[in-house]
Amino acid sequence: MYDTVVIGGGPAGLAAAISANKEGAKVLLIEREPKLGGILKQCIHDGFGLITFKEKLSGPEYSERFIDKLFETDVEVKLLTFVTKIEKTENGFTIYFVNRDGASHVSTKTIVLATGCRERTARQIFIQGTRPSGVFTAGTAQNYVNLM
């Protein structure tokens, strides 16, 4: 059983996992993407890190610093993992998830939901019509540009 399961590996999830671990909790961090960092991976402008790291960093640089701090701990991380269900139990919660290893579940005393933000498609907000091939949301376009 975990003390804390953090769902989401963006800036808030990373900070929560590191803080909980620092307080002595046994922590699992679950992230649906192949990489940690969340929205920060898209923020190529600088200005991050002035307070925490005392220097001006881009979003990806800032997230890498937190990822490095995370991997200095014994927090368990599951990438490419999608939470399918959360059940309240007598002793906490059961979190069901699926990943490349198949379907599984874990028990935890507490949950931190740090699922972040992402843009929604026209269909998700009930705008009728079709999207032409090659048209992306701003966030998707930023992500592709930053990967190149």
Per-range role (PLM):
Residues 1-5, 64-69, 73-148:
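FAD-binding core/adjacent interface of flavoenzyme oxidoreductases
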